[in-house]
From Swiss-Prot:
The keyword Repeat applies. It comes from the Eukaryota. SMART domains: C1, SH3. Residues 220-279, 280-337 form the SH3 domain. The gene is stac3. Keywords: Cell membrane, Cytoplasm, Membrane, Metal-binding, Repeat, SH3 domain, Zinc, Zinc-finger. This is SH3 and cysteine-rich domain-containing protein 3. It comes from Xenopus tropicalis. It is found in: Cytoplasm; Cell membrane, Sarcolemma; Cell membrane, Sarcolemma, T-tubule. It is a peripheral membrane protein.
Length: 337
């Protein structure tokens, strides 16, 4: 009759949430500390500034060129024979080089085109129309045979203007030889006396000749002259000579045209075609073309040019002069004449 009621389970009280989301009786409070790590930027050292690269404002314009005739490289002075005689030639200055030598002339300035009126041979720079002409000794050879009519006209005009001057100089006696006729008149008086023996007469003549030679104004024997270029006579009274010949100067009163003698031949020639050589100096002929570096005092010369030694050998180079410029040149490319 009597039934037992099931015990009602009392709902357990939910604990109140505390601040900061902490549960009661959950143990000691744990605090978390977050440290912000600041990345320290390492100061990178700036690299040293690069040196300014030299800029060539007048570079060569090289193009592949087939060399029909044997040519020497203007850098290494060796013949261009590889790759079926193909090389590089500058469009402006006509410089010939190997393909593997192009890096050596990267910073060398181009001389530019040669005026067509001055395409003349290095052996006769004023009046020759041959190939391989040069305006200046620093300029490379040209590969053209063309001439300028203006240049030819000026050349003829110079020749005509010099004719009267040469004739006038021929009429006048050479001042170097004027002393001899002044001393000749006393000879008849000596013959009239008849008291001087033959031996004494010969002695007096020899003494007079020695005096004339000593008193004769002119060039000293401490030096002589050598032809730099080949000069072809244009007139009958011109002196024809080859490059490297020794010339005896007779008259140098004119600045442009001198009178000289080679062997038994005598005549006029341009004064800038010869160079004075001292007794202790040597004369050389260039056997190979060479492009020198001006920054270290080297000189650029072409084959068959005539130069004069001006210094001793240093590390295979000697100081030479062409009359217009002086510089260092390899001794192996020179032949003494």
């Amino acid at each position: 009759m009597f039934k037992k009621k099931a015990k009602e389970e009392k709902p357990s009280p939910v604990p109140d949430a505390q601040q900061n989301g902490e549960l009661p009786n959950s143990g000691p409070i744990i605090y978390y500390i977050y440290e912000s790590e600041e990345e320290e930027e390492e100061e990178e050292e700036e690299p040293p500034p690069e040196p300014p690269r030299p800029v060539n404002d007048k570079p060569h314009k090289f193009k592949d060129h087939y060399l029909k005739k044997p040519k020497f490289c203007d850098v290494c002075a060796r013949m261009i024979v590889l790759n079926n005689k193909f090389g590089l030639r500058c469009k402006n200055c006509k410089t010939n080089i190997h393909h593997h030598c192009q890096s050596y002339v990267e910073f060398q300035k181009c001389f530019g085109k040669i005026p067509p009126g001055f395409r003349r041979a290095y052996s006769s720079p004023l009046y020759s129309n041959q190939q391989n002409a040069c305006v200046k000794e620093l300029m490379p050879f040209s590969a053209s045979n063309r001439t300028d009519p203006v240049f030819d006209t000026l050349r003829v005009g110079v020749i005509m203007a010099n004719k009267e001057r040469k004739k006038g100089q021929d009429d006048k006696k050479n001042p170097m030889l004027e002393e001899e006729p002044e001393e000749l008149p006393p000879k008849p008086e000596e013959k009239q006396e008849g008291d001087v023996p033959d031996g004494d007469k010969k002695g007096e003549k020899g003494g007079q000749d020695a005096k004339n030679k000593k008193a004769q104004p002119g060039f000293m024997q401490s030096h002589y002259f050598v032809a730099l270029y080949r000069f072809k006579a244009l007139e009958k009274d011109d002196l024809d000579f080859q490059a490297g010949e020794r010339i005896t100067v007779i008259d140098d009163s004119n600045e442009e045209w001198w009178r000289g003698k080679v062997g038994e031949k005598a005549g006029y020639f341009p004064a800038n075609f010869i160079i004075r050589v001292r007794a202790a100096e040597r004369v050389y002929k260039v056997t190979r073309s060479f492009v020198g570096n001006r920054e270290i005092g080297q000189i650029t010369l072409k084959k068959d040019q005539i130069v004069v030694q001006k210094g001793d050998e240093v590390n295979g180079y000697i100081k030479v002069s062409t009359g217009r410029k002086v510089g260092l040149f390899p001794l192996d490319f020179l032949q003494e004449i």
